């Protein structure tokens, strides 16, 4: 049986939307899907398709993974905010609302990739049993 592995070489540029009409177009769902798909080995979709034969069931599984990655991403972002505030960070006002001051700002897409890789590890473990 072919094993699923986790790809730890995904970069922020890999998950950016390719065809966006405007910068205000929300692309988080696309980034979430790209992040976890790219975090799995090339054979992962074939292994999943062989295990979950029904297309509707497989699509429901993919949506569940999307939710799991999204929830993990939010968890990591909240953890970063809490740790930053505990370390003395302050919120500043910008034209878009409140955010952490520059010294504590991080790249949200990097945290998304970490979240996707954490979920990918679970997927690999589940399918490699």
Swiss-Prot record:
UniProt keyword annotations, A-Z: DNA replication
Taxonomic superkingdom: Viruses
One Pfam family this sequence matches: Phage_RpbA
GO biological process, one term: DNA replication
InterPro entries in UniProt: Phage_T4_P15K_Rpol-bd
Protein purpose: Binds to host RNA polymerase core.
Descriptive protein name: 15 kDa RNA polymerase-binding protein
Originating organism: Enterobacteria phage T4
Gene it is expressed from: rpbA
């Amino acid at each position: 049986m072919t094993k699923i592995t986790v790809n730890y070489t995904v970069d922020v540029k890999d998950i950016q939307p390719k065809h966006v009409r405007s910068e205000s177009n929300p692309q988080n769902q696309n980034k979430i899907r790209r992040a976890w798909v790219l975090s799995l080995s090339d054979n992962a979709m074939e292994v999943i398709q062989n295990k979950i034969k029904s297309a509707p069931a497989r699509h429901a599984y993919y949506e569940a993974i999307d939710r799991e990655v999204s929830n993990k991403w939010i968890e990591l972002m909240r953890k970063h905010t809490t740790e930053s505030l505990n370390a003395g960070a302050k919120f500043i006002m910008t034209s878009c609302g409140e955010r952490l001051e520059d010294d504590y700002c991080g790249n949200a897409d990097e945290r998304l990739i970490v979240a996707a890789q954490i979920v990918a590890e679970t997927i690999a473990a589940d399918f490699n049993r």
